[in-house]
């Protein structure tokens, strides 16, 4: 590892990840980079992380939100792979290892490994 980024909160870390993903996309020639996010996810309360969040209740009142996020079900590897394969604007996947905003949701064994495989 050549670099490390320290921040004060998960929200700040997610905000930086979103910015880096978009920058990566622009550097690769993608005009409108998109990030796959999961339904019922929570990523923070900045405008970018609210836009990535999968809870309409949390987003309410803060519109217009940012575009560039594609939602898929949390533990549905087939849908994730289909979207990642067929949408050429996808530059990243933002996923919580364990979802907690809508109740504790642990992914099935092998899910995160498969997500990583799709990304590489």
Predicted features and spans:
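PLP-dependent aspartate aminotransferase-fold enzymes
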Residues: 1-92
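Proline-rich low-complexity regions
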Residues: 64, 97, 107-108
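Short acidic-aromatic active-site loops that bind/stabilize oxyanions
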Residues: 70-73, 101-105
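Short acidic, glycine-rich surface-loop motifs adjacent to enzyme active sites
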Residues: 87-104
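Catalytic PLP-binding core of fold-type I/II PLP enzymes
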Residues: 105-120
């Amino acid at each position: 590892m050549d670099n490390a980024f320290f921040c004060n909160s998960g929200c700040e870390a997610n905000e930086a990840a979103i910015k880096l993903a978009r920058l990566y996309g622009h550097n690769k020639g993608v005009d409108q980079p998109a990030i796959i996010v999961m339904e019922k996810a929570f990523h923070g309360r900045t405008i970018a992380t609210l836009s990535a969040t999968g809870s309409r209740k949390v987003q309410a009142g803060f519109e217009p939100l940012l575009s560039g996020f594609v939602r898929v079900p949390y533990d549905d590897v087939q849908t994730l792979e289909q979207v990642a394969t067929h949408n050429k604007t996808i530059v990243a996947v933002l996923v919580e290892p364990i979802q907690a905003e809508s109740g504790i949701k642990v992914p099935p064994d092998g899910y995160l490994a498969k997500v990583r495989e799709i990304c590489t």
